[in-house]
C-alpha cells in the first residue's frame, strides 16, 4: 500500500475528532482490503514474541469504542509522538469496530517500528462471528471483507517483552509456557485453538483464591494464582506481567503484590459499566505510571486524570 494512501486513510479516520461521537468513516472496501494485506505482511515480518524498548505506552481492550481510542491518543500523544503497544480486543461489542481496527492497522503500517498490536481473544473468527464484528462487516461491506480481516488477525503476534523485564499478552500465563521460546515457535498464520499455549495466552485469568492452576468460569483455558505469577517471573528473570482481558473499575488493577497488572482502556464499557479506562506509561527506567480516562456523570464526556507512579514489581534499572 502506497504511503500516501495510508496517510489519506489516517487523515479521514482522524477527521471525525471534531464531530459528534459515533460518526462513521466510510472508507472504500478496496482501501480496507489493502490495509489488511499490508498490515499482515508487517506482522509476519516481526516475531511472535515482540522485543520492544521503553519508553512505551501500553493500552488494554478497546472493543470498538472509537471515540475513546481517539481520546487515548489525545491524552498519550498521537503516533509517532509516543510509542504504543496495544494488548488486543480491538473489535466487537462497541459501535465502531471498523473505524477502530482500521486506524490501528493504518498506524501499524505507517509506523511499523513504533506502534505494536498484539492479538486478543476477539481477534478470532469464531468469537467475532458472534459478538458483533461479523455483523458490522456484513452490514457495511460484505462477508468477504470479514474474511480478509480474519486472515490479517491470524498473523497478529501473541506477546511482547519490554526491555527483557515486562512481559505483555492479552490474557495470561499457560501451564504450557515452559520457556519464552515456546511463544516464538507458535506458527503463524493460525486460528486460535480451543486449548494449548496460544489459547491460554489469549484467554487465561489471574485468581487470588487459586493456588497453581484452576478452572476458568469462561469455560476456556485456566485461572492462575499468585504463586504461579511469582514462580514464572523468578524463573524467567522478569519483573512484571502486563495483560488486559478483564474490565477493572479504575482502568488498571494490580495482582500478586504488584507482579501483575490488568489494563482496560474502554471507559464506560458497553455503556453498562462505570469503569475508567487506563493506559500505562513505561519510562526508560521501567517506572510505570497510569493515565486514566475517567467515566463522567454525563455520558459521552470523559475526564482525564493521572495515576500515581508505581514501579514494576521491584524497581529495576534499565538493562
UniProtKB/Swiss-Prot annotation:
The active site is at residue 122. Its cofactor is Mn(2+). GO terms for molecular function: metal ion binding; protein serine/threonine phosphatase activity. Pfam families: Metallophos (PF00149), STPPase_N (PF16891). Its EC number is 3.1.3.16. Mn(2+) 2 binds at residues 89, 121, 170, 245. It comes from the Eukaryota. Binds 2 manganese ions per subunit. This is Serine/threonine-protein phosphatase PP1 isozyme 2. One of its GO terms (cellular component) is nucleus. It is an enzyme of class 3 (hydrolase). InterPro entries: Calcineurin-like_PHP_ApaH, Metallo-depent_PP-like, PP1_catalytic_subunit, Ser/Thr-sp_prot-phosphatase, STPPase_N. PROSITE patterns: SER_THR_PHOSPHATASE. Belongs to the PPP phosphatase family. PP-1 subfamily. Keywords: Hydrolase, Manganese, Metal-binding, Protein phosphatase. It comes from Acetabularia peniculus (Green alga). Mn(2+) 1 binds at residues 61, 63, 89. PANTHER family: SERINE/THREONINE PROTEIN PHOSPHATASE, SERINE_THREONINE-PROTEIN PHOSPHATASE.
Amino acid at each position: 500500500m502506497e504511503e500516501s494512501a495510508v496517510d489519506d486513510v489516517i487523515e479521514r479516520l482522524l477527521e471525525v475528532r471534531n464531530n459528534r461521537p459515533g460518526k462513521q468513516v466510510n472508507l472504500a472496501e478496496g482501501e480496507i482490503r489493502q490495509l489488511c494485506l499490508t498490515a499482515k505482511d508487517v506482522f509476519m515480518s516481526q516475531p511472535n514474541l515482540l522485543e520492544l524498548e521503553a519508553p512505551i505506552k501500553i493500552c488494554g481492550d478497546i472493543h470498538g469504542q472509537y471515540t475513546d481510542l481517539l481520546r487515548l491518543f489525545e491524552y498519550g500523544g498521537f503516533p509517532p509522538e509516543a510509542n504504543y503497544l496495544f494488548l488486543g480486543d480491538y473489535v466487537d461489542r462497541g459501535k465502531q469496530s471498523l473505524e477502530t481496527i482500521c486506524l490501528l492497522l493504518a498506524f501499524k503500517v505507517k509506523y511499523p517500528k513504533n506502534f505494536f498490536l498484539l492479538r486478543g481473544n476477539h481477534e478470532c473468527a469464531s468469537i467475532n462471528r458472534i459478538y458483533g464484528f461479523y455483523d458490522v462487516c456484513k452490514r457495511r461491506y460484505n462477508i468477504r471483507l470479514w474474511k480478509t480481516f480474519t486472515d490479517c488477525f491470524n498473523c497478529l503476534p501473541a506477546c511482547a517483552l519490554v526491555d527483557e523485564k515486562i512481559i505483555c499478552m492479552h490474557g495470561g500465563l499457560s501451564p504450557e509456557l515452559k520457556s519464552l521460546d515456546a511463544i516464538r515457535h507458535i506458527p503463524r498464520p493460525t486460528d486460535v485453538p480451543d486449548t494449548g499455549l496460544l489459547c491460554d495466552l489469549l484467554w487465561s485469568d489471574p485468581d487470588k483464591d487459586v493456588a497453581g492452576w484452576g478452572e476458568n468460569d469462561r469455560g476456556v483455558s485456566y485461572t492462575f494464582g499468585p504463586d504461579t505469577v511469582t514462580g514464572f517471573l523468578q524463573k524467567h528473570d522478569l519483573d512484571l506481567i502486563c495483560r488486559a482481558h478483564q474490565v477493572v473499575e479504575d482502568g488498571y488493577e494490580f495482582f500478586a503484590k504488584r507482579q501483575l497488572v490488568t489494563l482496560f482502556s474502554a471507559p464506560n464499557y458497553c455503556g453498562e459499566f462505570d469503569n475508567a479506562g487506563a493506559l500505562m506509561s513505561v519510562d526508560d527506567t521501567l517506572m510505570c505510571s497510569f493515565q486514566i480516562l475517567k467515566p463522567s456523570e454525563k455520558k459521552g464526556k470523559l475526564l482525564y486524570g493521572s495515576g500515581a507512579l508505581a514501579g514494576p514489581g521491584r524497581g529495576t534499572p534499565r538493562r
